């Protein structure tokens, strides 16, 4: 127990005080605003995905003045039908405060991260931030495993648990009290804690950064215990099993059970010890894979449920964890459908006068694009209908033609960029077709013309924004095979500059 306490307190030695005054600094809200607009290449800005950009320094100054006047109840009023001062909706001020909170609470953790990199080569760890860095790991490890636990991570049953966890890292009582007040008065919290949707409610787009940080920190606390137990599994489980064995000898009344347990003692220990266990997480989903038996996976399943409910007060249910076999199950993770498929090959072996033909089946990770959910995401963004028929984008008709083409072309390139690791890239042709024809319909609507006449007038130059895609990038990365376009289209490439999933590709 003392070792466990030292493990938990190891990373908490750098607590930060006096975070509350930062909430009244204008540059904090500027940082929060810039965070949403300066993402990596695959992430579109808020304007591209039709989110309103309402940030201004004048609004921030008025918000800070109102906070100095201690009129928080007015700012966080639940009545969304009324307008706050100068015609701005109160929801805007609530969202700005949450963005400021998100920047401030990240400061202690950012300082701890910087200090951990002191004296180390940070450049080598940057690539590990990419979402695509997970898939090379899956290609190396998953092909040798048998079963997988598909886990929907639960969320805390009460928001006070989030504040209590932060008390271990932040000692500014004023900031924590204001944080608690904000959580209780925040008008969207009831919708964030409901279970009416299958999606984890803490990942809704509105004020996502703030609640996502609180949720990830809560999960981090539970995972720290889990990883500690995993690292110490050999010692802890062996000790526990030996104690149980001594107890059976002490009672000594069930002779048959004594003999069976003694003979299969090493087998029982193997059921608990699994050196081929792998675990990774993204958003509200985690994957645990193993080479062990289904019995071992069931033990891990109920162990996680009891750990969440009894020690961390997560609202968890066993049906949120599914045990599947990798050979006949598609893993829905990070926008891909991944599965392990045997790749048969024939090897001819010549030994003197005898020749042998050997059939070999090597497991291979198969990653495909979930075309139906992706079309549904495009339909939600008003690029097509639910059946995949392209439609125009009326909201963009006020923009210049070059901006419209640039927006559609950027989204098309980003989709190709993210799904460059797909095993079957032909499924992307339909997505590109939807975006190209939606762009043509938008331009034709703007100029009050038909799509056919508009395309005839522009000719092939119209498609240049869409055609400069993966082929040219791959020919630069893989010059040796650039002459073979057929082989080039089958190559899977994972990029290390993707740190966030585009909203169109976030199918969770």
Swiss-Prot record:
Subcellular location: Plastid, Chloroplast
GO cellular component, one term: chloroplast
Keyword tRNA processing: yes
Keywords: Chloroplast, mRNA processing, Plastid, RNA-binding, tRNA processing
Disulphides: none
Family matches, as InterPro entries: Domain_X (IPR024937), Maturase_MatK (IPR002866), Maturase_MatK_N (IPR024942)
Keyword RNA-binding: yes
Function: Usually encoded in the trnK tRNA gene intron. Probably assists in splicing its own and other chloroplast group II introns.
Protein name stated in the entry: Maturase K
Lineage, top ranks: Eukaryota, Viridiplantae, Streptophyta, Embryophyta, Tracheophyta
